[in-house]
Amino acid sequence: MNLPNKLTIFRILCIPVFVVLMLVNTIPYNNYIAVGVFIIASLTDMLDGKIARKYNLVTNFGKFMDPLADKLLVSAALICLCGSKIPVWIVIIIISRELFISGFRTLAADQGIVLAAGWWGKFKTTFQMIMIIVLILDIPLKAFDIIGWILIWISLALTIISMIDYVAKNIQ
């Protein structure tokens, strides 16, 4: 197994650690530690792709699992923030998009076609990760609340745009 694929697996293994930190309030500074774990996991998303492309280590496993790892990480964070920081209906829309695209990719994989993530999807994921970090930090400033809401709405818009783009480019 090459390094980019190991980074993808590491990102997936970070998810339960992140969730425990988000949900167990008895751990001192749990939100800050959770943000640290989330940032490290998110950075592996950038690293695995760059390393894979630079050293010609792109694999079908990576093309399939890298976006899935992103979906799992972001979805876990959204579920942890659901209701308290993000309205439930927005979380439902975002996770529904992720499930739809995962199903779409699975159908393609059954036919021997591996659909790589597109630019809009990568942009959406990056934006969602930034939004999640801002919301978890929960800095008690009005400007920070406004930034959080702006990020939520932009993430929702990018979720819809990226789904339309993905389906339009890959429907066969």
Language-model features: where?
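Alpha-helical transmembrane bundles and membrane-interface segments of multipass inner-membrane proteins
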Residues: M1-Q172
